[in-house]
Amino acid sequence: GGAEYALMTLLLDHHCLKFERQDLLEQDIIRTRSALQFQKKHLDRAMDRKVHIYRILDSRREHFKLGIPYQKRVSKIEALYTRPEIEILYIINEGKYETFKKGNTRPHEYVRRQLANMPKGNIKSKDYVTAYWEPQLERLIETIREYARMTPDPFEQTLAAILK
């Protein structure tokens, strides 16, 4: 989604990831969810090396199965989860994770209702995410690492796994 794209762009542009923009296919973050569309759009041309795919997801239900002819062009496909939702990073950053856990509210609803001190706006928009996190980039990195410690997902399936 837009929030994930904005976060990844921030981390990439500030050299916080294990890879740089020039390492990326087309030197950009690709927002294609469908394996069929991805292979047609990005793997249909001759390439001098295999591609490593990172997928940023908030659900384990999404499947990404490349066709057999395209599988040989990919070295690995890794899913990185921001479950239950990317808004969990706001909740952790604002020091409200324990309170959030006690309730029964989705993260985006919790942020909207309980974090009144946060700037108003669409918390999932690229502009909002950039305006909120860019001035506190070190805090974003700390929050991603903190989330990796809290989540039941294995470390290698969190955004922290691709941080420098």
Give a label for each model feature.
Residues 5-25, 38-164:
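C-terminal accessory helical subdomains adjacent to catalytic cores in phosphodiester-
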Residues 30-40:
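N-terminal beta-loop-helix "entrance" segment that forms/cooperates
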